């Protein structure tokens, strides 16, 4: 089922946390180890990046505003990661971000398998 699927995922995140706090939050959520702005977990690597396209006004657009959120997370599986576990872990990260009050939207080939279709389906 997953053999042909690209497992790269980009999560756009809008939060009041600064980047260092977001890195800590993600590391705790995914039970990972921090190395500057990269978190390594048993299932994947997460890079927390500032979004060069960040624009507070454009981020409010209900259709594609997520493209202008303050941060994005580049997420890739580690070698030999189980695809099902990897996708479930991203789903759990999304849920934790939403629960914290952050806005988060996933852009990946498996959005349909994530809660709220990766954040595009609203509440």
Q: What are the language-model segments listed below?
A:
Residues 1-32:
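Short, extreme N-terminal segment that most often corresponds to the first beta-strand
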Residues 1-8, 62-74, 79, 113-123:
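Intrinsic low-complexity, intrinsically disordered or marginally ordered coil/linker segments
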Residues 10-12, 47, 70-74, 103-107:
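Ordered hydrophobic segments in well-structured contexts
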Residues 12-17, 76-78, 110:
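Structural motif
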Residues 19-22, 79-85:
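Short, surface-exposed beta-strand/loop "edge" segments at domain boundaries and coil↔beta transitions
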Residues 33-82:
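Short, intrinsically disordered low-complexity segments
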Residues 83-93:
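Well-ordered, non-membrane alpha-helical segments in soluble/globular domains
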Residues 91-123:
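Acidic, proline/glycine-rich low-complexity IDRs
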């Amino acid at each position: 089922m997953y053999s042909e699927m690209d497992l790269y995922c980009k999560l756009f995140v809008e939060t009041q946390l600064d980047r260092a706090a977001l890195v800590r939050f993600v590391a705790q959520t995914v039970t990972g180890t921090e190395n500057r702005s990269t978190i390594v977990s048993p299932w994947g690597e997460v890079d927390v990046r500032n979004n060069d396209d960040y624009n507070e006004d454009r981020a409010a657009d209900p259709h594609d505003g997520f493209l202008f959120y303050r941060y994005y997370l580049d997420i890739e599986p580690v070698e030999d990661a189980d695809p099902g576990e990897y996708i479930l872990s991203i789903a759990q990260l999304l849920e934790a971000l939403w629960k914290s009050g952050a806005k988060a939207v996933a852009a990946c080939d498996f959005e349909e398998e994530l809660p709220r279709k990766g954040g595009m389906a609203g509440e």
